């Protein structure tokens, strides 16, 4: 079970999973395709670690991303850089933390940036394989 939260950015949302805790530890579903209501199908997963205070982005790619913080915390931002979008130029930010295992879905052609609020580790799932020729940095 998850709570799916809409944002002001067209097709951007964030997920807050239900965590099951007991004396052994924690279990939660950080991604399930039926949670997304999109055609998102991950084909690549990436690991990214950053030191506290690191600012990364804004990176724009032609593929969608699903970002989860598995250690520490970040302020994560989606920027709508799609010229034909009704929400073009708007942005949405959310704190992603390893204590909540919440995730942000970033639509294709939107920008992505984050500030590491503490040392952190992010896992990105993408619906296409990375191609450096298609990556744009602002």
Which residues fall in each region the model found?
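Non-catalytic, conserved peripheral segments adjacent to functional cores
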Residues: 1-99, 120, 124, 128-138
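Conserved metal-binding segment of the jelly-roll/cupin
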Residues: 96-118
